[in-house]
């Protein structure tokens, strides 16, 4: 009889512990392409079905860091940069996680026959790139050796590299937009139907959102991308 009571008590304690874990704060993370050609990481902390905090960061792609001059380890290409044709020296070979990229004059960075942007359609590959950047694990091949001092988190993470640090008139800049977006999600979750309807159009800026009575406080034109990566994290 005592043995049965001990077993029953152990089961009750285990169930209670599992219930406490389930009710406690959970950090959820999702990755995806944002702002057309960046990898975003959305993180939410959920407790009791509600969001207690949210954060966003972005990693630039390997094209963001180029060499100052041509060498045996670079490929020189003419590309469009903010509407103007410019010549850039891209690093020929870049490695991260289990993926090796080679720069192609026609398709840009590729892994085998797969273009980088097609590779990043899979969340797992977005995670590999983002976390490699964040941990300073991206290698650039220089003179046959792996160099991890070129494509660093300081150069590629928007939270560190000063991206859009000086906003234009009536804009917030990267950091303030990120904070406004996260504050909106924490306050409102993902149930605002009028916001969803506008988001479905595929383009969303603060003026359009305000016109429908949903004020996010953000001013970036790709609000939908950041909203969706946070939503994907919440739904995991």
Language-model segment annotations:
Residues 15-29:
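Sec-dependent signal peptide cleavage junction
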């Amino acid at each position: 009889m005592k043995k049965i009571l001990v077993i029953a008590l152990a089961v009750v304690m285990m169930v209670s512990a599992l219930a406490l874990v389930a009710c406690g704060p959970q950090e959820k993370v999702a990755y995806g392409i944002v702002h057309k050609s960046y990898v975003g990481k959305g993180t939410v902390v959920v407790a009791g079905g509600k969001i207690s905090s949210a954060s966003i960061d972005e990693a630039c792609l390997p094209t963001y860091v180029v060499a100052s001059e041509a060498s045996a380890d670079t490929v020189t290409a003419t590309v469009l940069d903010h509407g103007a044709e410019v010549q850039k020296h891209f690093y020929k070979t870049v490695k991260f996680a289990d993926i090796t990229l080679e720069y192609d004059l026609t398709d840009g960075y590729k892994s085998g026959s797969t273009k980088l942007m097609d590779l990043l359609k899979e969340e797992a590959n977005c995670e590999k790139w983002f976390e490699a950047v964040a941990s300073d694990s991206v290698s650039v091949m220089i003179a046959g050796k792996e160099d991890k001092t070129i494509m660093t988190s300081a150069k590629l993470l928007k939270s560190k590299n000063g991206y859009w640090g000086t906003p234009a008139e009536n804009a917030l800049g990267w950091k303030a937009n990120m904070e406004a977006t996260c504050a909106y999600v924490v306050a409102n979750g993902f149930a605002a139907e009028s916001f969803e309807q506008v988001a479905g159009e595929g383009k969303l800026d603060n003026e359009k959102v305000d016109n429908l009575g949903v004020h996010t406080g953000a001013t970036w034109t790709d609000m939908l991308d950041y909203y969706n990566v946070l939503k994907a994290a919440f739904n995991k």
